[in-house]
Amino acid sequence: MSRLKKLYTEEIRKTLQEKFGYSNTMQIPVLKKIVISMGLAEAAKDKNLFQAHLDELSMISGQKPLVTKARNSIAGFKLREGQGIGAKVTLRGQRMYDFMDRFCHIVSPRIRDFRGFSSKGDGRGCYSLGLDDQQIFPEVDLDRVKRTQGMNITWVTTAQTDVECTTLLELMGLRFKKAQ
């Protein structure tokens, strides 16, 4: 069992139940999955660059990414139907907790001028953020990076509100900006 999963089962669940007054333990929010996605439309023209970004996403997540393909052709964007335009990885279970632990304690402190993430969610218990650079991850070999590439990370929880979601993620180690 990972350190973060153990922390969740032993401490975070109790804290959330006390704070929000849940009458049933099944109401306590749980982290369901983490989705990491990259839009690689510019890299789609260069197969070597596209493959390099796929390899980086694979190293960051620990599993093979799914290539997202264009649904239809758009001549103005020089896009063909079925052409790879992005990649995504869905993390669940042990890998999800390992990624969350690494992201909170190793990756986010490496972000330049980091003062915390925005605490605004989607209103339904999910939280998303965008990163500008993949080089903040220690798994990425800086000598092999051909071009900086951003990514989106989405945490999907069973929380009903943004407050519950951000409280859960904050207790797990994600740092948010303080309201002023």
From Swiss-Prot:
A Gene Ontology biological process in which this protein takes part is: translation
Which molecular-function annotations from GO does this UniProt entry contain? Answer: rRNA binding; structural constituent of ribosome; tRNA binding
Q: Which UniProt keywords apply?
A: Ribonucleoprotein, Ribosomal protein, RNA-binding, rRNA-binding, tRNA-binding
Q: Name one GO cellular component term.
A: ribonucleoprotein complex
Which InterPro entries does the UniProt entry name for this protein?
Answer: Ribosomal_uL5, Ribosomal_uL5_bac-type, Ribosomal_uL5_C, Ribosomal_uL5_CS, Ribosomal_uL5_dom_sf, Ribosomal_uL5_N
Q: Where is the signal peptide?
A: none
Share what the entry says about its subunit structure, partners included.
Part of the 50S ribosomal subunit; part of the 5S rRNA/L5/L18/L25 subcomplex. Contacts the 5S rRNA and the P site tRNA. Forms a bridge to the 30S subunit in the 70S ribosome.
Give the function comment from the record: This is one of the proteins that bind and probably mediate the attachment of the 5S RNA into the large ribosomal subunit, where it forms part of the central protuberance. In the 70S ribosome it contacts protein S13 of the 30S subunit (bridge B1b), connecting the 2 subunits; this bridge is implicated in subunit movement. Contacts the P site tRNA; the 5S rRNA and some of its associated proteins might help stabilize positioning of ribosome-bound tRNAs.
Q: Which family does it belong to?
A: Belongs to the universal ribosomal protein uL5 family.
What's the protein called, per UniProt? Large ribosomal subunit protein uL5
* Species annotation: Chlamydia abortus (strain DSM 27085 / S26/3) (Chlamydophila abortus)
Q: What is the lineage of its organism?
A: Bacteria, Pseudomonadati, Chlamydiota, Chlamydiia, Chlamydiales
What is the gene called?
A: rplE
